[in-house]
Regions:
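Non-catalytic macromolecular-recognition regions in eukaryotic signaling proteins
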Residues: 1-181
Length: 181
C-alpha cells in the first residue's frame, strides 16, 4: 500500500531549502492566489513488502517511482468558482518500507487565477501515481488538505543583513520556510 501521510513545508537550511519527512504537518495552508500557485511536499510511505525473496535471483520490484499527482478540488466556502481537476508532475523514488517526499504544486497557477481576488477555503484531494520497478502502474491513497485562499496574505520574511537576502522556500505568496541566504 502506498500512503500519502502528510503535507509539509520546505525548511530553510544552510545551502538552500530542504524537505524532511519528520517535519510536522501544517494542518491548514494559506496562500495569496493573486501571487500564483501553492506548492508543498507530500510525504509518501511505501508499505509494500520487499518481494526479492520470492525466487532465487529475483530483485525487489516494489520500490515506487512517483510520476504525477491528480488533484481534485472541493470549495468549502466563498463565492462559487469552477476549480477543474489538475494533473501535476512529481518525482521521487520511495523505497520499499520507507518514506519519501515529492514536491507538488497543489494549487497550480490556473486554479489560483480562477480563485482570483476571492477569499475562500479549498479542499485539495491529492492522489499520487507512478510505477513500481517492474513497470506496473500504481497509485497512492487520496489525501485531503484544506488551504485558505486569501488575497491579503503576505509572508513575513526575516530581516537580513546585506549581502544576504530573504529567501522564501516555496514562494513568497504562501506559507513556507524562510531564511537569509
Amino acid at each position: 500500500m502506498l500512503v500519502v501521510s502528510k503535507v509539509i513545508q520546505a525548511k530553510f537550511a544552510t545551502g538552500g531549502c530542504t524537505y524532511d519527512p519528520t517535519t510536522l504537518e501544517l494542518t491548514f495552508g494559506t496562500f495569496n492566489p493573486l501571487g500564483g500557485g501553492y506548492t508543498h511536499g507530500l510525504v509518501i510511505e511505501n508499505h509494500l513488502a520487499d518481494n526479492s525473496g520470492l525466487a532465487p535471483g529475483r530483485v525487489n520490484t516494489n520500490d515506487f517511482q512517483v510520476e504525477f499527482a491528480v488533484i481534485d478540488y472541493a470549495q468549502i466556502d466563498g463565492p462559487a468558482v469552477i476549480l477543474p481537476q489538475q494533473i501535476v508532475p512529481g518525482n521521487s523514488l520511495i523505497r520499499t518500507g520507507g518514506k519519501g517526499i515529492t514536491q507538488v504544486v497543489i494549487i497550480p497557477p490556473p486554479v489560483a487565477q480562477a480563485i482570483g481576488g476571492n477569499t475562500m477555503k479549498v479542499r485539495a484531494q491529492v492522489q499520487v501515481y507512478g510505477r513500481l520497478m517492474d513497470g506496473s502502474r500504481v497509485k497512492s491513497s487520496t489525501y485531503e488538505y484544506v488551504i485558505q485562499a486569501d488575497p491579503t496574505f503576505v509572508l513575513k520574511g526575516p530581516t537580513c543583513t546585506a549581502p544576504q537576502v530573504a529567501v522564501a522556500c516555496e514562494g513568497s505568496n504562501q506559507d513556507t520556510g524562510t531564511g537569509c541566504g
